Amino acid sequence: MKNKILRSVLMVLIWTFGSLTMLSAQGSYSNFNDLTDRLNQLNSNYGDLVSLESLDETADGREIWVLTIGSGDIENHPAVAVVGGAKGSHIFGSELALTFAEKLLARSNTDEVSELLETTTFYVFPRLNPDATEHYFADLKYERDVNTISTNEDRDDAFDEDPFEDLNGDNLITMMRVEDETGKWKMLEEDNRLMTQADITKGEQGNYHVFTEGMDNDKDGAFNEDGEGGVNINKNFTFDYPYFEPGAGENMASQIETRAILDFLFEEASNVFSVVTFGPANNLSSPLRFNRGAVSQRVITGWYEEDVAVNSLVSEAYNEITNLDYAPANSGQQGDLFQWAYFHYGRFSFSTPGWAVPEVMDEEGNSQKFESTDAKFLVWAEQQGMDAFVDWQEVNHPDFPNKTVEVGGIKPYVSFNPPYSAVDSLAESHTDFLIKLAGMKPNVQLVNFETEEAGRNLTRISVDVHNSGILPTAARLGERTNWVKEVILKLELSGNLELVSGDVLETIESIEGDGSLTQTWLVRGNGSFTISAGAPNTGISTIEQTIR
């Protein structure tokens, strides 16, 4: 017995050390090979708690991974889907999803997490758009959100004929400004390194044109409008799909990456009660507001009031744990995963960028106010000793003879991806939040069970179907769709038991948090019976009894 206990302790230490080694050895954001190695190590170290599956391969042959975490009957345990990397340039979201999985499993030897994983499943999609994200590691850096599928963005029947060019030779694609009296742009007064559009209503006048760095290769008057690839996966989902918009694809759900997650969630993950996206949308730092007009239309475009209340509750928990209440609100964009998860998948959908530029203090310790978020970022970056800006440099440009053309601007990626040194602490707090969210899950229990003799060989059976969770068993919008399974209450009789009154099967659309409903049946005879209640996204509770 002592040897068995010792072996168990050693195993816990090995697993924990392995996870800590993964975290401490990592010194920079993970490219696809690093990400795959870390996932395989989790699969090897925690084989009884995880399974690693490739949903498909991208155009460049990269796997679209999903890591399932949990124990026992995982398909019938309420689940949280955690998604990173839908926006290709937001590499922090991908890193956050992966590091969450590592930190959660590193805690699996604690009572809190061990018990959680016995009743809750996590589906982690660490990098939904790996081909786009991989460009972060390319020699020539530019913010890329699209995959590598060739597209004809300018509809001229030529593909990828007008890409970016590195005009100043720094291996970064930034911005280009051209001095011209007819321009619509001017220097920002708050920080003259930055450019802003002139506001004619305020009497402002522009004196620059602003483009992304490059040349007009196809001579159509537009710059870099048809570069390499592709489709932005975070604009390719089915809700509010932006037809004909650059990067959205030829049609909704047209991409391997999009279909991979849609097929998995619809076909294999009916137990999901919430989707958490690490991306640009943000309804966690600031919850959404109820808009009665948006829910009164034939096509609903806003959250129901009951669901907004849930959003506020979860947001309060998020801010208490992460202290990110200062992060800007963002209700999402057309065709994104965040909105799809609520409006078309019918689940509670939460999203956060996971990081935002903190408050900037002056020399006296007072918070500085900024009109421009970019100006705020540059002051903060300088305080951190970051090299975040390419100074404007004059270049010769064949498309603008006799004009002053300069290249410069904020470096790619740095304004919305934190320094890697911040990842560990941010992942720690977001792991705490996801554990908290999982603990709020709907949880159907059969309670207050009673049998009572009713005379003449009759027995009255009564039970309360109770949702002991904080969240309702379904979002209000989920009640309107066919994609969220309703709670099923079922009575099964055996022996010579005969049902006199009541229904052997009932469906319940939703039970609010800490809510209950009572069900009674009248049966004749004796024998055994089974009562079960629940759904994959609420857990299933069962009572077995015999009437003699």
List each model region and its residues.
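Bacterial N-terminal signal peptides
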Residues: 9-21
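Boundary at the C-terminal end of the N-terminal hydrophobic targeting segment
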Residues: 23-27
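Metallocarboxypeptidase
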Residues: 51-52, 63, 83, 95, ...
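Active-site/substrate-binding loop(s) of hydrolase catalytic cores
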Residues: 76-79, 91-92, 99-299
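Short amphipathic, basic-aromatic surface patches that mediate peripheral association
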Residues: 465-480
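Edge beta-strands of extracellular beta-sandwich domains
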Residues: 539-548
